[in-house]
Amino acid sequence: MKNSAAIFLTSSLILLLQTLHGVKAGFICVGSSFPTNSSYQKNRDSLFSTLSDKVTTNGGFYNASLDGVHVVGLCRRDYDRQGCINCVEESIRQIKTSCSNRVQSFHCNSDDRERVSCLVRTTDQSTYRILELGPATNDPSPVAIDTFAKNMTLFRQEWEAMVDRTLEAVTIDNSTTVLKYYGALKSEFSEFPNVYMMMQCTPDINSGACKRCLQASVTYFRDQNWGRQGGGICRPSCVFRWEFYPFYGAFANVTRVPAPPRALIPRTEAISITRLKGGIIAIFVVPIVINLLVFIGLIRAYTRIRKSYNGINEAQYDYGGQSKLRFDFRMILTATDDFSFENKIGQGGFGSVYKGKLPGGEEIAVKRLTRGSGQGEIEFRNEVLLLTRLQHRNLVKLLGFCNEGDEEILVYEFVPNSSLDHFIFDEEKRLLLTWDMRARIIEGVARGLVYLHEDSQLRIIHRDLKASNILLDAYMNPKVADFGMARLFNMDQTRAVTRKVVGTFGYMAPEYVRNRTFSVKTDVYSFGVVLLEMITGRSNKNYFEALGLPAYAWKCWVAGEAASIIDHVLSRSRSNEIMRFIHIGLLCVQENVSKRPTMSLVIQWLGSETIAIPLPTVAGFTNASYQAEHEAGTLSLNELSITELSPR
């Protein structure tokens, strides 16, 4: 009776709080601004004029483009037609009011009273069939769970089980409707109020991407909002929300799902049975596993010996089945005018880079690796095996390769504006980089890293992210390049140890320099250095004799003088936004690896000015040993990957 009364009172309180939490709307404006009455605004408004009608007539989702303007609209499945129209038009009105002249905008409109939810996004880059985790809106309930706080452990277990069931319902949905990735479940918990949970993804992405998007939202809620009475997180690719009351009218015809039954075996008995079974299994399994590991070790040792003795026939090596991307050497000679000096656009640690033109007129960039360079062979193979399997607008595209005789050549898309370092560290060219342009470059690099770490079919650690390895296309969009030092991780692998440190000192994380361990957080550190360079307009090399840029920025932050490091050419009217980016950069370059954020979390922070972010702790290499480590690093520059491009 006491439990029933508590549940009734809690449910009543929740219903009273709906008026506080029922209307949920959030908008985010990012990127550069466009002039009033510009062609961009006219094209955007033209798409807006028909968007609500297009969404409803196309089954609840619509993606449209017009001369560089891209618009996406999504409504909840089983939507009411007029409700969807009203929701989309309200989102458009909010964007025009709050993000009137911003190139990129995102509005998530959720109104319980109108029984509808929708999202609208505008951008200058196509996002069709691309998983987009940011920008994101976060809307937790303002009310904390305290009525049954003593049972929070049990509640969390049942809540997690419900998340798993909803995820499964969403990602294996075989619906023939446009809005195929959708799930709304009601779960009746034995000791708590009913829980209502809804998940939805845009239908243009695949089920794996849908699952990753929703898992990211669940993880964020669990890490940042746990203890709140419900809430929602809205991303361009997915929506997640749960409450103690029905919302959107999404649960009228939903089958109730009972909570999984609790174990009937007493805990002590269950443990003893488990231990007994485990002991029996171990007796038989352990010897088998040991013998298997020994056998695998012998096979691997034999393979290494055989390779070192016989060598590798590069002419017959198909590079992971990518032989179809093989270029004829004579074609490359013609394209580059026999590697003429006039076509040379850069010189790297392992070869030269040339501009070329294919017979069809397509411009290409050709990297000709230095003959006899052992490290160059590793770089060559790495790039072929990795880049041919990666596709993202913020990664440089590998068109093909050539390995005839002693030649090892990589052919890339041509990126006309060279690399970032030729702009940000040049006194004159730096003036061209407005804050909006710098912010867009930073966000683009972050998206490229999220793809490498989380969203591609592989998990890749770049290990050599720096300004000279970020190329800029004709529209100054960034493309991460040079994957010669990259390492492939298993999806469940978190860290690795290398025998030799490779990379560029100043961008390498402390744990990598000191202990030779690396992980996704190693790339996060490098990203933080690049971000701080973008804000200051100065290379980390300029700080070598003193502290290093991360440590210098940290000391200024602690002293309350962080604004002093901002590039003087940037507008002071944007100082609040720039200070937030400095804050994020310092979080990325923290000495403590575990405190550095993931790149997906960085994307969320960059895309929203309302999400609270933690205070940074001490930056890497802040202690007195920095100078000694720098001197040790300069002794091994021959082992580092250093590529410098010069425009012609």
Curated annotation (Swiss-Prot):
SUPFAM superfamilies: Protein kinase-like (PK-like) (SSF56112). Residues 339-611 form the Protein kinase domain. PROSITE patterns: GNK2, PROTEIN_KINASE_ATP, PROTEIN_KINASE_DOM, PROTEIN_KINASE_ST. SMART domains: S_TKc (SM00220). The chain crosses the membrane at residues 279-299. Residues 1-25 form the signal peptide. The modification Phosphoserine is found at residue 468. It is an enzyme of class 2 (transferase). One of its GO terms (cellular component) is membrane. The keyword Secreted does not apply. Residues 300-648 are cytoplasmic. Glycans are attached at residues 37, 63, 151, 174, 253. Residues 26-127, 140-247 form the Gnk2-homologous domain. The keyword Amino-acid biosynthesis does not apply. Residues 26-278 are extracellular. The modification Phosphotyrosine is found at residues 412, 512. ATP binds at residues 345-353, 367. It catalyses: L-seryl-[protein] + ATP = O-phospho-L-seryl-[protein] + ADP + H(+); L-threonyl-[protein] + ATP = O-phospho-L-threonyl-[protein] + ADP + H(+). Belongs to the protein kinase superfamily. Ser/Thr protein kinase family. CRK subfamily. This is Cysteine-rich receptor-like protein kinase 38.
